[in-house]
Amino acid sequence: MGNGYFRTSQTSSSSRQREKRGKDSYSYQHNYVDRVRLEDTTGGHYHNNQHQQTTHDPRCPQLRAAGWRHTHKSVSHLDLATSCHDAAGTGLGRHSQQLHHHHSNQVNQHHHQQQQSHHHLQHANLHSHHPHAQPHWTQCRVGGAGSGNGQLRNARSLDYTQLEREENALDIAEFYWRFDAEAPLDQVDSYAVLPINDNFEPSAATSTAVGSKETTTTVANKANGSATTNATTAAANALLDILGSESCSLRRSRSLAVIREETFSDLQIGSANSSRRRSQLIPRARLVNRGFFRESPRSRHKFQFKQFKKKPPAKLLRLNGKPNQATLVGEQPADQPTADDTQSQRSNSATCDSHQQQQQQQHQPQQQHQQQQHRLSGESRDFDVYYDNLKRLDALALNLSEQLHPWHNDKSDLESLNSDYFKNSLHQNHLDQQQPSSLEFEALEQVAASLLKERPRIYQSRRQQQKRNNHHSNCLQRHLDTGGESCPEHSQSSVFPETTTSNSDDQTDSPSLSEQEYDLTHIEEIYQQGNNGEESYEIISLTTTTRTRFESSEEGEEEQTGEEVVDSLTTPTEPQTSDSESTLRQNHNEQLDKLIAYDSVYLSSEDSSDCTLVGESCESFEQRTFTSCGESGELETRSLLHISIEDTVYEPQAKQHKKATNQEDQPAPLLTTTAKVEAQIFTQVLKVEHTPKPNILAVVEKRKLKQEEVKHQPPELKRQATDSFVVTANKSNLAENQYHSLPDVNIGVSLKVCESIDKELRSSYNQQRQQQRKEAKKEQQVTRAETYDSIRRFGRAHQKARQREYQEREREREKEASAALQEKDKEREREKPKINKEFSAQERQIEVKETTKSQDIIKEKEQVSRKEEAEDDEEEEPLPPPPPPLTEESQQEDTVADVEEEDNLSVSISQPEQPKEAPVIEVANFSKLIERRAQEIRERQEQIKPSFQIIVTDAQNNIIQKEAIQENKETSQRIEPKPSPKTNSNSSSTCNLVQRPLRRSVSSSSGKPLEHRILSTGAPIYKARPVRVLPSSSSDSSFSRGKMSRPQILHVVDGRGGVAGGGAGGTLRRRSSARSIASTISSPGGEVANEYLQKVDAVRCYWNKLAGNEPETLKTEQPAKETQPGIHFQLGGETTTQGTDKSAVGNDFCSMMPHPSIEIVELGEGAQKATIVKAAPEREEDPDEDQDQFDHIRYKVLKSQQLIRNNFLSTRNKKEAQFDGLIQYLQEYSFQELLSNNNVVIVEPVRTKIERPLQVGINSGSTTTPTTVPPPKPPRVVNASASQPRKTRQKQTGGAAAKRHFFYQPVRVNRELYEDELPDPDTVRNVRRFFEQNVLPTPGQGLLVQSQQKFGGSACQLSPKSRRARGYRYLTIDTSYGGAEEQPKGMEMLEEHKAKHWDNASLSSGISSGVLSSPCGEYHHQESPVMACKDVHVQDVVRRHNSNAANAKARAKFASRRTWCMGAGGPGANESLYRQIYENNLGNSEQQENGEHLEEEDDEQDDQYEDDVEQDMCENYYVSNDVLAKIRECGSTVTYYGGRVLDKTATSTAAPSTKTTQPMTGSATRSRIRQIEACNVCLPSERCEHRLQTKQAAAKQQQDSYQGIKFKLVKSNSCSSRLELAGTGEDEVTADSEVVRKMVHHFEANQTTASNDVQVTINSQSQITSTKKEPEEDVPRRQVTVNNHINVLGDTMPQASQEKAENFNGRPEENGYGAVETVPTYESQAMNIRLDATENKNILQTAAATAAANKVCRNKNVDLAYTLVKTTTNSPKGKPIEAPRQKIGKQLREVEENVEKAAVTKATIKLTKGAPSQIIVPVDIHSQASIVAHTAPIPERRLSNASSSNSVVDKTVVRHYVANDKSIYERRKYDEIEFEEFEVYDPSKEPPPQVEEGTDKIPTDAELYDSLDDKM
């Protein structure tokens, strides 16, 4: 609602409703910080109200738009309380004045059915007479005078941090929009601060001064006697004023920001992403015109509706839900002074949308009768009381100080207010929260009691007022036309930053929120009552309708009133029998339901559940509307029509017919409803044209169409519109929020792009759905696709809401035209363009012309000519058709054109109205320019309308009458399935659009017009569009209504509907008509129009592919797309132009989001094909490999448009690596949510894109069947990152390079390293053989296969890395080990990645191999076959790779079976087979332990055979010291100890893997010690014995404790040793085995508590043993951070520094990840190990001294410890890439923050406490001094890593990253890109988080792994 508090409360109720809908995931934590904003509340509010379009933001642009932050930055609730005194006095005085005026207006409105235009004029006069007459509560001003300037505008600012967490960001935004929309500008300026003082005397004085209207008296007397009720009512009214008017204004800024925010939240992609969105949204948020346009006209209409609905209690209760915002003090006089009692009630209700509604629900029964008397003073006091309570609530729920500055980006503010206010107040304790909130429960009970008394009367009065409502519907229609533009006021230029869906929802926030609260009160009743289920769903539909209303303020008000009607209808229908209970319930539930309704509105937009509910209850909703039609169905009809407005360009008329048929008072309400629909359409259009606001054009015309069509709209059409709208609203929010859930790279840029595109698409969907609804009106059936379209259109309505100021001005126009609307709508329409000019909405003026004309025509022939109407609107919309049937057709088409203008805005439908739409779209930035252009075009259009019809016919490729063309267009655009072949193509596209446009609408719901979105996508497009709009306007001058622009947008529609598959007939026709119109109407502008249309088509095609299944088709079509126009989008393949657009869009589908759109526009300016061609080449620059991927990213990454632009747009191949990391993140984490929430099937294309790099990697070095697997395996999305790094190392081609920039630059470094140590072809062949035969083909071993496939072929990645070099193999093997635990699903891949990471870190490549080899054998014996087997396959594969690659002979003997230990612990099912393999190899490995070094070599050589393939994987060749030194020098992760990546064998499974690893480590250590003999750090036997024995025992004890990790930690006993694993030197590498053994022995025998030293670190690795196997090692383990970290392989494995640091922390086995989290000391090591994998980056983050050490300082101890760590690392490696990317990013951030390691910020993955693979390969090769130095911070780091990794890191992702040291590095690239999830594991920052966990935390392996899994 208007007031943030009630909005918050409403959000709670909405969240309740969402929970009912099954959207419990919504955390309604939107903290509406009540901001007192000193707003310049001059008397010009009336001026604004009258000249909403022109002077809507006289002060609002300054204060509202200028920013709440700078003006009301520190104003808090208390400030509101203080300022509320003045506001109470002033605002209530104004309330009385306005109430008085509104009372007369209400009286007039009672006659307004006959005097709709009169009412508008009277309303205008009212505004003129009383500048603050619009929203009653808006009149509460800080200044003492009625229009005191500089008043504190109180509004609850959204806490955008919470919003980012909030799925229901739209709820918040809608709440603010309700705030902003309800109050007129002046009132918004002045509504700031009434509420805090309960008995604020100025409030009462104002009420008294204003005359203590019946409302005030009623409020005062009814609530708490004159004083208490006045105080409560005055507080409520003051709150209504503050929150209603100020919230409107605030919500203009907030809803602008919040709506985009909410779009992000609705996207539910990432809570962490939302904050970024929030910050981007906040600057875009403007408080300028939203409240004024939404509040004053819409409030007036809403209030009129209330007054007409003379059921004061019920309606007021309902109005509390819905009209509270607008119908308080200001709106009541503004809307309907006639129905003063209803007005007061409504005003009260409307003002406190959620809380004030609650409060007034409490006071309503008492107040309702007294409200009219004491409405002004009582409302002022109620507002004070309410605001006091609200402030109290905010202080309670919100952490007052925080919530005060959500615009200051107080995330906790929204969090506290949203979560507490919503959850506590509504979800947890609605009544209890109401007590802390502004309304106390006592007052609520009082209001409930009085409402129980009065609610029946309210219902009766509603029924009595039904005819009034019909009149009021007419009046309200004009008001709503203005009020609908008030929504566009909300959707002014800053609206586009918001999400379009949010615009829809939030535009309807102030009135619609009230309605929604009514809706949700009714919904609550419905839910409570068995019969209420459908109605509650219908209320949800009304909630969606509310969004649509916000879409167009006239719709918003009308829908608000209609929502009230729905509530009244629904409530009378159901709770009439139980009116007392219902009243109480509505008192209570209305507060709850208001929130629910608000959330429901967002749910409607966000959730397909709302669509489902609509499916369930849409008919019931329609029935209820029909049933209530006699009572107050008119309002409900308007609501329904509002619902259909956004979603049906054509359907609004159909809806109106529906409603008209079903409602007794059909003519006026239906007419109003039709106007609503049209208004929404035009609102969106104007939103596009004018920066955010040109939607008013659609609003006015919608209303007129509604008002006229309402008479001719059958209930079926109404039903159709309602159903369609509800579904569409759901989808729009969902898609919109999904769109915004992208990681916030540059959400502002991406949002701009996405919003522009989405607005385009949404408008196109509006057009399509409107066509479908016209058709459906004829058919009189509402398809769910239409309903979804309605929801999408509803999202567009949010954009229109941004154009609310234009809608408001159009409302003023409609006020003038209201009287003559019924008489001469066309004349009015022609006059209104002048009015639009007057109101600085030229385009909207034209739209108003069309609206009036369309309304008249729709009245005449809405249902029959609905399709014609779309076409005729396009063709001759400004020009009234000369013959009556043609006139009806034309005007209906005009209405449709208004609707379609918005649709064309997004969809670029080829209807002549699209030319009108194009300037509308372009008005996003060139609003006035485009408006002028559009006016010229529309004037010409009126002149050239007949030719326009002809052009439409030709352009649609079907020379048909306007009727037929419109039908076809409607069929193609609106109807998902259409009989015509083109329509069938369009059906596929439209069905996709129904789902895709949902997302597109969501994207465009960002509040950006399509052009704005395109501008964001590519500034050139947007900039070019305005330029083209001017030529388009010149060419459209004949179309006289921006039709040139609209054909351009029609092209977009074609690009979306027709470019997909050549564009359906209608889409093709639309594009052709758009192009033909562009070229035919005016040759200069026509060319530009065609170019613009092609641009729009490219954008639309881009978004089509982006939106739904088409992206997959695009995947197939992308190469041919340039050549073949219609391959991908088979909707309209008929047209070559569409094909060209398709080519451009197909090629740009990925890059279109960032650049192709821009390129299309740039080229489009010069030539259509040039534009598309350029866009297509851009796409080709990014060939198929990235296109599908970016289909997803378009939704998600478009938010991060800057990321895409910086990376993807600017030669995506250059930055494709960074963007690939983002893409991987999106596809693995964000896109999953995005796709699941949006029902988008784009995940596969993204995966395919990622898989392409996988294919590249597979082709480069795939040595196993997984090579073939990666392309078809989306599960490998996670592995795609690791796999792609491998590919990058192997093949720095487009795909690999694309991923590499994020994850693979280190691969480049390693590539150099690998060039020297390329894997032997035999090793590659053996590994491939192994994978093909064992891993891939055997389903019993399916874990490995599945994991590989799931993660994009980590085995494949292993193979390429093996081929490339041992370093690649290292990472692969490490991943396998680390993922051993997690392997059940993809842990094998994760383990591979972990092992790979260890290899990259070059921990103790030889040592790890040797040590892990024997322990793996023993562990295999010791532990369950599954555990032993799981990690073995990956490690064996990698081992084979490594051993064959680097020193096949030397490494063959080296602990080839150590990998078995790694895999042994991890997988439960697949491990057994691999375990058998490992057992077989274990015998050999143990023999090798016995000293059979040559035997091992033989085994490794045998591994080259199939048996030996497995064994080769198991066996680790000796890596000569030279090789190790070279590896370490190269900075690659020397996982080769004995020429093998043995250190990767850190079993990410339980400690049993470590146990096995330790025994295997004995043999491997023997082999290594043979190498390490030079170092002589440890006796091979010591290590062998201790490791095999103590660690076997410890692994047995700590099977659940990641002893394998600890075993690795023992290897990285010392920082030097562990760093040596990162690459100390070949001697140290050799010493690693010995050092690990020796350190383990030292720690065992000496129990060195100084294990923090380098050697102690290796002992700490032994600490794994120390916990259970090696008691001696256990003590040092706790001490040794590296050991602990390695022990907690899953946790610290992702970061080598974490491994080492955790090893330092000691006792990682006991700690499990706790030990791992003691790695902070080794953060530099982790960084350096990463330097091994990615030397450059490691050096970057590692200390300068460590940089050299990274290569050379690989201590043997570190290598040994790292080998052990690698053994443990496996589990999280692959997985973190997948889901935990955000988690990993967060944890990594925590770890990075906590870790103070100077140089080792490069830890690959934050430690996942439960994932052993998080011991990161990138163990920095620090000197032991460095390592020791890091030992101190290790505890912090371990804790953070463990907690962060466990909670957030997906084991698979961790494995993936940990396995790939380059993955760690590329994770760094994600960090650079601001990826939360891909934040580079910063060892320097990680140790503190590790310390969180502390070395003491020694969970068992199961605990550690489980914790990781739990948080994955």
Swiss-Prot record:
Keyword Cytoplasm assigned to the entry: answer is: yes
Q: Which GO terms describe its cellular component?
A: cytoplasm; cytoskeleton
Q: Where is this region: Disordered?
A: 1-32, 89-145, 298-377, 460-515, 545-586, 764-920, 965-1010, 1257-1297, 1486-1507, 1881-1912
Compositional bias, Basic and acidic residues, is annotated for 772-792, 802-869, 965-979
Instruction: Give the subcellular location.
Output: Cytoplasm, Cytoskeleton
UniProt note: phenotype after gene disruption: RNAi-mediated knockdown results in abnormal bristle morphology. The bristle ridges are shallower than wild-type and become nonparallel and disorganized near the tip. The tip of the bristle is swollen giving it a javelin-like appearance. In 13% of animals the posterior scutellar bristles are fused.
The residue ranges flagged as biased composition, category Acidic residues, are 553-566, 890-904, 1494-1507, 1903-1912
Q: Please list the residue ranges that the record marks as compositionally biased, kind Basic residues.
A: 97-133, 299-313
Report biased composition (Low complexity) as residue ranges. 355-374, 499-512, 981-990
Q: Report biased composition (Polar residues) as residue ranges.
A: 339-354, 489-498, 568-586
Q: Which UniProt keywords apply?
A: Cytoplasm, Cytoskeleton, Developmental protein
GO biological process entries:
chaeta morphogenesis; parallel actin filament bundle assembly
Give the protein's function: Important for normal assembly of actin bundles during bristle formation.
The name this protein goes by in its record = Protein javelin
Q: Which organism is it from?
A: Drosophila melanogaster (Fruit fly)
